[in-house]
C-alpha cells in the first residue's frame, strides 16, 4: 500500500518511556495501513531515549514523520502539527481520513480501523468516531472518584453515540480541516472541550464511538500504586486556573524516501534562520559527526511563554463527577497526555517526580530567530471605562486576550507566566469585602504581577474604609480615584512590592527585554497623577485617601485631568461628578460600613450546567428581586459556572451562600463556608438515597426540584424550590409552540432505554410521527425542535425511576403544550396534576392517552397556569426566608 493510501495518524507522546514504547509497538503492527506521525513534547527522556528510539523507527520506515517540540506545550503541540500538515501535505483528496490520538493507548481488537471507518461511512452526520475505553483497570481503589470517568453511550445499532477524549479519534479529513479553521479563527486550540462544543453547538453533528473495539488506558496502570510519584501528584490540590496558549519551536524529521516537504515550509515559519542539522549544529559549521538521522526541518517559531506545566496530551477520562455525565473540559496531565481526568495541575511540582521538566535542554537545539528584537511587547491593559466606545476591556498578554467584564477584573501573572483571573461586579457595595480579601491574598505569594482593571461604572459605591486595607497593604496612593465613574487600572510588581504604574487613561503597554530582566512602562496618553503628601492633622497619617476629605468645603471635579496638582487638606470635600450627573460625595466622617445583603452563588461544573440551566434560571432572578424595604433582607445572586469549582476561593461569611448543582467535592465538605446542594436525581433509586445521605450527614441543606423527592427523603432540613414560571422563558416557548408548523405528533426528549423504546415504537406502530431528541439536544436547538410537535410525552427511564420530571415538562406545560406523563410515585402531590395541566396515566395506557390527547381540542388552561404560577412564587419567597 502506498503512503497516499494510508491514513495519517497523529500520536501525542511525552516522557513516559515504557508507555510510549507499548503504544508505538501496537501502532507499528498497522503500519501497512497507517502513516504514523509522532508529536513529542520535550522531556528529560527525549535526547537519551525517546528521540533515538523514534529516529530508528523512521529509518526503518515504520514511522512517517516526527515533530519534536523544544519544550512541553501540552495539546498545543498537536494543534501546531495538524496546522502544519494541513498547509503542506494533508490533502483530503489523497488522505480522506485522519487519526488523532494520545500516545498511552492500545487496542486488542485487530479490526478497529475497519470498524471506525465503517461507522463514518454509515453515519454522514458523524463529526468523529472515537474508540470505546476499557474500564478494567479503572483506578477505583486509589482514586474512588474515577467511577465518574465512566461515560454513558447511546446504542445506535452498529455504533455508540457519546463523547470520548482523544482516543484513536478518526475524522474525515475535510471535517477536521474545517474544525481546525474554526479553532484558528476563534483563537482556540485542539482540545477535547473545544471540539465537543464545536461538533454539537456549531455543527449540530454527533460524536460516535466504537461498540466492539476497546482501548486500554496504559496511564491508569500508574494510578494502581498509591505510592507512585505520579499518583501522589494527581491527588494533590491545586489553586491555579491555567490559560494555556504556549507555543514553541519544533523540528520535523522524516525519512528520505517520503520527504516531500523541503520546499513547503514558508519563510515566515522558518523565520529566515539557518537550517539546524540533526546534531544541533548550524549548517554553516561543518559537523564531524556522521549524519545517521532522517531529513528534518526546524520550525523555530518563537515561544511567547515558558513551559509552565508538565503535561500535554488530551485524554479520555472525565473529571471527578458524582453524576454520570462527561466533563468535557480537557485538562493537562503530566504523563504527557492532556487528560480530562486531571484538573488544574501546578507547574511547581518537585523535580523528583516523573513529570518534571529538565533544566538542561541543549541551547543549540532550537534557536531564537536571528531577527528577533531585543524588546518585546508582552502586556497591554485596556480599560474602556464608561461610555468610552465598544472596545472590550481586558488584558493582552503573550499575544492572548483575556477579556474583562463589568466591575473589578483581577489578573495575576505567575513567575511561569500563567494567568489567573477573577471578576467582581461591584455595581453595588456588597462585593467589596470579598474583593479586598481576594486582592490581599496575593501579597505574599509567588505570583509576579497583580493587575486590577476596572470596567464600566463598577466603582460608584465603593466604601473607602474597606479599600483602605488594600491601599495600605499595597501602598496604592491614588486608590480613592476609584470613586470616579471612569476607566482605571494599576499594575503591581508583587516581587519588588512596588506599583509599576496606575493610570486613568485608556491604554497602557508594558514592554520588556527578551530575557525579561525588568519592565519599562510605555503609555500612549498622558498619565494622570496625584502626589498625596498632605497629612491629615487629625491622624498624622500619610498616604491614606480618607485623610484628604472632610465636610467643610467642596471642590467640583468634572475631568480627571483637573485632579493633577490638586492639593487636598482636611478642610475640603472632594465632590466628583459622574458622567450621568449623579453626584458621588464621600467624607471620612460620613462613611459607614456597608450593609451587605445575602449573596447567593449558583455553583456548577461547566460541563454539566446544561442539565440545570433552565431550572436555575427560573428562580435566579427572584433571588435578585427586592421583596423587602429593609436592605438587610434584600438578596443578590450570581453564577459560578466553571470546571474549576473544586479550587474556587469560597468566602466564609454569613452573607455568602453557595448553592451547588448536584454535587460537592468531598474536600469541600469540611470547609466552613455556607453551602447547599441542588439535588435532581431520582430518589426512588437506592444509590441516590445513599448519595444524598452524605449531604445530610454533613449537615448540608439539600434543595429539591421535586416535591416527590422531598417526601421520599423525609428530612426536615430539606428545601423545596419548584420550577418557577419565568415570564421571559415562557413567552419564548409559547410563541415557538403556537407559531411553529407541526411536523410531528409526539416529542420525546431524554436518554433512551428499552422501557422508553417500547412506548415510542408502539406510538409509531399506530401511525404517529415521533421526534426523538436523544442526548445532546439543549437550549434553543432543543426548544425549536420540540415546538414542531403537538404533544410532549414523559416516560420513566426504568422501573426504579418513578419521580415526575418537572424540569422537562413544566416549562412546556406553562407554554400551553399538552403533556402526557407516566404516573409517578407521589403524583397526588403535584400541582400540575391537581389543576389538570399535565395528563397522567399508567405506563400501559400511555399510547392510548396520547392518541386521545391528539384527537381532543387543545384547550389552553390559562387559569390553572396562573394559579400554579402564583402558588410557586409564594412558595419560593417563603423558602427564601429560610435559606
Curated annotation (Swiss-Prot):
Biased composition (Polar residues): 334-347
Positions of region (Disordered): 258-373
InterPro entries recorded: Nucleotide-diphossugar_trans
UniProt-recorded name of the protein: Uncharacterized protein L138
Source organism per UniProt: Acanthamoeba polyphaga mimivirus (APMV)
Signal sequence bounds: none
Compositionally biased residues, Low complexity: 259-268, 277-317, 324-333, 348-368
Protein family per UniProt: Belongs to the mimivirus L137 family.
SUPFAM superfamilies: Nucleotide-diphospho-sugar transferases
Amino acid at each position: 500500500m502506498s503512503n497516499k493510501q494510508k491514513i495519517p495518524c497523529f500520536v501525542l507522546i511525552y516522557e513516559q518511556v515504557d508507555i510510549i514504547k507499548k503504544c508505538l509497538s501496537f501502532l507499528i503492527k498497522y503500519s501497512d495501513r497507517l502513516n504514523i506521525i509522532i508529536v513529542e513534547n520535550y522531556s528529560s527522556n527525549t535526547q537519551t531515549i525517546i528521540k533515538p528510539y523514534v529516529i530508528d523507527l523512521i529509518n526503518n520506515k515504520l514511522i512517517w514523520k516526527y515533530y519534536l517540540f523544544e519544550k512541553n506545550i501540552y495539546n498545543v503541540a498537536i494543534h501546531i502539527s495538524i496546522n502544519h500538515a494541513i498547509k503542506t501535505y494533508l490533502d483530503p483528496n489523497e488522505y480522506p481520513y485522519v487519526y488523532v490520538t494520545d500516545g498511552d493507548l492500545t487496542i486488542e481488537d485487530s479490526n478497529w480501523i475497519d470498524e471506525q471507518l465503517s461507522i463514518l461511512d454509515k453515519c454522514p452526520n458523524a463529526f468523529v468516531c472515537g474508540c470505546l475505553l476499557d474500564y478494567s483497570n479503572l483506578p477505583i481503589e486509589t482514586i474512588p472518584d474515577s467511577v465518574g470517568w465512566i461515560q454513558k453511550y447511546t446504542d445506535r445499532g452498529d455504533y455508540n453515540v457519546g463523547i470520548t477524549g482523544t482516543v484513536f479519534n478518526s475524522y474525515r479529513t475535510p471535517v477536521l480541516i474545517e474544525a481546525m479553521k474554526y479553532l484558528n479563527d476563534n483563537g482556540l486550540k485542539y482540545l477535547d472541550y473545544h471540539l465537543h462544543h464545536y461538533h454539537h453547538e456549531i455543527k449540530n453533528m454527533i460524536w460516535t464511538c466504537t461498540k466492539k473495539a476497546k482501548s486500554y488506558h496504559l496511564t491508569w496502570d500508574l494510578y494502581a500504586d498509591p505510592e507512585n510519584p505520579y499518583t501522589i501528584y494527581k491527588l494533590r490540590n491545586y489553586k491555579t486556573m491555567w490559560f494555556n496558549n504556549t507555543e514553541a519551536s519544533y523540528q520535523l524529521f522524516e525519512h528520505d524516501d517520503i520527504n516531500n516537504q523541503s520546499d513547503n515550509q514558508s519563510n515566515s515559519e522558518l523565520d529566515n534562520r539557518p537550517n539546524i542539522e540533526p546534531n544541533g549544529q548550524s549548517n554553516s559549521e561543518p559537523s564531524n559527526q556522521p549524519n545517521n538521522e532522517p531529513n528534518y526541518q526546524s520550525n523555530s517559531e518563537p515561544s511567547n511563554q515558558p513551559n509552565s506545566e508538565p503535561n500535554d496530551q488530551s485524554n479520555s477520562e472525565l473529571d471527578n463527577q458524582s453524576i454520570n455525565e462527561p466533563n468535557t473540559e480537557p485538562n493537562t496531565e503530566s504523563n504527557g497526555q492532556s487528560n480530562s481526568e486531571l484538573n488544574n495541575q501546578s507547574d511547581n511540582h518537585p523535580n523528583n517526580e516523573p513529570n518534571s521538566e529538565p533544566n538542561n535542554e541543549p541551547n543549540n537545539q532550537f534557536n531564537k530567530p536571528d531577527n528577533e528584537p531585543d524588546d518585546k511587547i508582552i502586556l497591554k491593559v485596556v480599560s474602556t471605562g464608561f461610555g468610552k466606545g465598544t472596545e472590550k476591556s481586558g488584558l493582552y498578554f503573550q499575544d492572548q486576550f483575556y477579556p474583562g467584564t463589568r466591575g473589578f477584573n483581577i489578573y495575576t501573572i505567575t513567575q511561569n507566566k500563567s494567568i489567573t483571573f477573577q471578576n467582581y461586579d461591584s455595581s453595588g457595595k456588597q462585593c467589596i469585602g470579598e474583593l479586598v480579601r481576594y486582592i490581599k491574598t496575593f501579597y505574599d505569594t509567588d505570583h509576579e504581577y497583580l493587575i486590577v482593571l476596572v470596567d464600566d461604572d463598577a466603582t460608584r459605591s465603593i466604601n473607602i474604609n474597606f479599600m483602605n486595607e488594600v491601599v495600605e497593604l499595597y501602598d496604592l496612593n491614588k486608590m480613592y480615584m476609584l470613586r470616579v465613574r471612569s476607566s482605571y487600572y494599576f499594575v503591581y510588581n508583587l516581587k519588588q512590592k512596588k506599583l509599576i504604574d496606575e493610570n486613568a487613561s485608556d491604554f497602557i503597554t508594558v514592554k520588556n527585554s527578551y530575557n525579561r530582566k525588568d519592565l519599562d512602562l510605555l503609555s500612549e496618553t498622558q498619565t494622570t497623577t496625584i502626589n498625596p503628601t498632605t497629612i491629615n492633622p487629625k491622624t498624622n497619617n500619610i498616604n491614606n485617601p480618607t485623610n484628604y476629605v472632610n465636610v467643610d468645603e467642596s471642590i467640583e471635579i468634572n475631568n480627571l485631568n483637573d485632579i493633577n496638582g490638586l492639593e487636598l487638606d482636611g478642610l475640603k470635600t472632594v465632590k466628583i461628578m459622574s458622567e450621568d450627573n449623579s453626584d458621588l460625595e464621600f467624607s471620612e466622617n460620613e462613611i459607614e460600613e456597608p450593609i451587605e445583603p445575602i449573596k447567593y452563588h449558583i455553583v456548577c461544573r461547566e460541563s454539566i450546567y446544561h442539565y440545570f440551566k433552565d431550572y436555575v434560571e427560573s428562580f435566579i432572578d427572584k433571588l435578585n428581586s427586592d421583596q423587602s424595604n429593609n436592605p438587610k433582607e434584600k438578596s443578590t445572586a450570581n453564577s459560578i459556572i466553571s470546571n474549576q469549582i473544586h479550587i474556587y476561593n469560597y468566602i466564609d461569611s454569613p452573607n455568602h451562600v453557595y448553592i451547588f448543582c448536584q454535587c460537592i467535592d468531598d474536600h469541600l465538605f469540611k470547609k466552613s463556608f455556607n453551602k447547599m446542594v441542588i439535588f435532581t436525581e431520582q430518589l426512588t433509586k437506592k444509590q441516590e438515597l445513599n448519595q444524598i445521605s452524605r449531604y445530610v450527614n454533613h449537615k448540608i441543606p439539600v434543595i429539591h426540584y421535586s416535591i416527590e423527592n422531598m417526601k421520599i427523603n423525609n428530612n426536615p432540613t430539606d428545601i423545596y424550590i419548584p420550577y418557577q414560571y419565568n415570564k421571559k422563558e415562557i413567552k419564548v416557548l409559547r410563541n415557538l409552540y403556537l407559531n411553529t408548523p407541526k411536523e410531528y405528533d409526539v416529542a420525546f426528549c431524554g436518554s433512551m432505554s428499552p422501557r422508553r423504546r417500547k412506548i415510542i415504537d408502539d406510538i409509531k406502530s399506530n401511525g404517529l410521527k415521533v421526534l426523538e431528541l436523544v442526548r445532546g439536544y439543549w437550549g434553543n436547538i432543543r426548544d425549536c425542535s420540540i415546538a414542531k410537535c403537538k404533544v410532549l410525552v414523559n416516560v420513566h427511564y426504568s422501573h426504579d425511576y418513578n419521580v415526575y420530571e418537572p424540569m422537562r415538562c413544566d416549562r412546556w406545560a406553562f407554554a400551553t403544550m399538552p403533556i402526557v406523563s407516566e404516573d409517578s410515585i407521589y403524583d397526588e402531590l403535584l400541582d400540575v396534576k391537581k389543576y389538570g395541566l399535565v395528563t397522567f396515566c399508567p405506563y400501559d395506557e400511555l399510547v392510548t392517552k396520547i392518541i386521545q390527547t391528539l384527537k381532543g381540542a387543545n384547550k389552553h388552561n390559562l387559569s390553572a397556569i396562573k394559579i400554579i404560577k402564583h402558588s410557586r412564587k409564594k412558595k419560593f419567597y417563603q423558602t427564601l426566608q429560610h435559606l
